[in-house]
Structure formats: structure tokens, C-alpha cells
From Swiss-Prot:
This is UPF0304 protein VSAL_I2183. Pfam families: YfbU. Coiled coil: none annotated. Belongs to the UPF0304 family.
Amino acid sequence: MDMTNAQRLILSNQYYLMSQMDPENAEKYQRQQLIVERGYELQIRELDKDFGSISETECREIIDFMEMYHAMQESYNMLIPECQAKVDARRLQFLGFDIATEAQQVNYVRFLTNSEGLYPQFDKADHHFNSQMPMMDKYRRMLTTWRNCPRQYHLCSTEMAQIFNA
């Protein structure tokens, strides 16, 4: 991130104000203030690590993944108990994405569930949609299989197994 001295001064002052307003996180803000004031380029890069963008196509794809899980959960609830027994209910939980390699996707899912209030039935679990392993390729394979199902919101246990195993 390239900044003029004036921009660095403004940002430094912002971090100072934040450290005063939020004593619980004061140490973090003081560290960031020091990084900006001294111009440590390597550490400055970490200040904007959460900046980024997800294209409209990527956003729609993530929503499609979440909608697929919603459809599987609803389908499961409509199954008779004998058919439900054939489905591992734990696999119906939307795990999210890997924060280490798919941070933008994790943050988008958190935005959709927290800020937008979508998919309130999804269990955030302890990791709050951090699957701790890359999931994008897996979800894409699952989505392809789900889209090939004739009744996407009335899946049978066999179709769910095919989606899980994609």
C-alpha cells in the first residue's frame, strides 16, 4: 500500500483515536500506529490484508453453494424417518471456507449470515464458517451434481449421497 506522508499521518492519528476509544484493542491499534508512522512496508501490507473484492459472479456462486445446502436441509426434513436414516445429518451442515486460503469467501459468508440475516438456520459452530480446509473445488463439484437433479428442493437420500460424494 503506497501512502504519502500526509496519508500516513492521518492513518496514524486514526489508530491513535481508535486506541483511546477501544481500550480492549488498544495494543493492536498502537502497534498499527507504529507500523504506519515508521513505514514498515512488510507490516503495512498486513494492514490492508482484509481489503479485497469478490466479483458479482463469485458472490452469486457462494450464494448458490449456500442455497444448495439450504435445499439439502429442507429435503432432509421432508424425508420419512427411514430415508433420513440413510443420510449422515452432519454432512448437511454448511462448513464455509478455509480462512487461510479462502478468506474473502469466509468473510462474505459471515456478511451474508450476520449483516444480511440470510440462512439463519445455518449453524455457525465454533469456527464461524471457517472450514479449516479449502472447500471451493468441493462445493463446485457438489453444485454441478445438485443442478443435475430434477427436483433440487425435493431430493431423495440417494441424490444427497451423490451430491456429498461429488
